[in-house]
Swiss-Prot record:
Part of the 50S ribosomal subunit; part of the 5S rRNA/L5/L18/L25 subcomplex. Contacts the 5S rRNA and the P site tRNA. Forms a bridge to the 30S subunit in the 70S ribosome. It comes from the Bacteria. One of its GO terms (biological process) is translation. The keyword tRNA-binding applies. It comes from Syntrophus aciditrophicus (strain SB). This is Large ribosomal subunit protein uL5. Keywords: Ribonucleoprotein, Ribosomal protein, RNA-binding, rRNA-binding, tRNA-binding. The keyword ATP-binding does not apply. This is one of the proteins that bind and probably mediate the attachment of the 5S RNA into the large ribosomal subunit, where it forms part of the central protuberance. In the 70S ribosome it contacts protein S13 of the 30S subunit (bridge B1b), connecting the 2 subunits; this bridge is implicated in subunit movement. Contacts the P site tRNA; the 5S rRNA and some of its associated proteins might help stabilize positioning of ribosome-bound tRNAs. Pfam families: Ribosomal_L5 (PF00281), Ribosomal_L5_C (PF00673). InterPro entries: Ribosomal_uL5 (IPR002132), Ribosomal_uL5_bac-type (IPR020930), Ribosomal_uL5_C (IPR031309), Ribosomal_uL5_CS (IPR020929), Ribosomal_uL5_dom_sf (IPR022803), Ribosomal_uL5_N (IPR031310). Belongs to the universal ribosomal protein uL5 family. GO terms for molecular function: rRNA binding; structural constituent of ribosome; tRNA binding. PROSITE patterns: RIBOSOMAL_L5.
Length: 179
């Protein structure tokens, strides 16, 4: 079992029950999935960029990526419907907990001038999004072998009904929020 999942079951559930007064442990919010997305607008001109970005995302997450395609044509961006414009990975179960553990304890401290993640990027329904400016914060990526520094979006989807519940869940899981 992943270290963070074990910690969730033993420490986080009782803490959330006492804080929010849940009557049943099944009412406690749980993480459903983590979606890691890389939008690559420059992939329109050069398709090889997409391959290298997909390889990096596979190394970071340990799971096969899905290539995202344009939903509609946009003439100003020289974009046609069906063109590959990014890649994404959806992590669930054990891999989700392992990724979050690595992200919190290894990757986030490697960000320059890191003072904590923003507490304001909840969506109103208990989901949290983080933007990462460079993929080199992950230890799986070797700085010498990358072509270009790319960012990514990380969305943490929870079963929480409110932002306060989701914030408490992530805080107990170890996400360092800015005060």
């Amino acid at each position: 079992m992943a270290r963070l999942k074990d910690y969730y079951k033993k420490e986080v559930i009782p803490a959330l029950i006492s804080e929010f007064g849940y009557k049943n442990p099944m009412q406690v919010p749980v993480m459903k999935k983590i979606v890691v997305n890389m939008g690559l607008g420059e992939a329109i001109q050069n398709v090889k960029i997409l391959d290298s970005a997909a390889g990096e995302l596979e190394m970071i997450t340990g799971q096969k990526v899905v290539i995202t395609k344009a939903k509609r044509s946009i003439a100003t961006f020289k974009l046609r419907k069906g063109m590959s414009i990014g890649c994404r990975v959806t992590l669930r179960r054990e891999r989700m907990y392992e990724f979050l553990d690595r992200f919190i304890n290894v990757a986030l401290p490697r960000i320059r001038d890191f003072r904590g993640v923003s507490p304001n990027t909840f969506d109103g329904r208990g989901n949290y999004s983080i933007g990462v400016k460079e993929q080199i914060i992950f230890p799986e990526i070797e700085y010498d072998k990358i072509e270009k520094i790319r960012g990514m979006n990380i969305a943490i989807v929870t079963s929480a009904n409110t932002d306060e519940e989701a914030r408490a869940l992530l805080k107990f899981m170890g996400v360092p929020f800015r005060s």
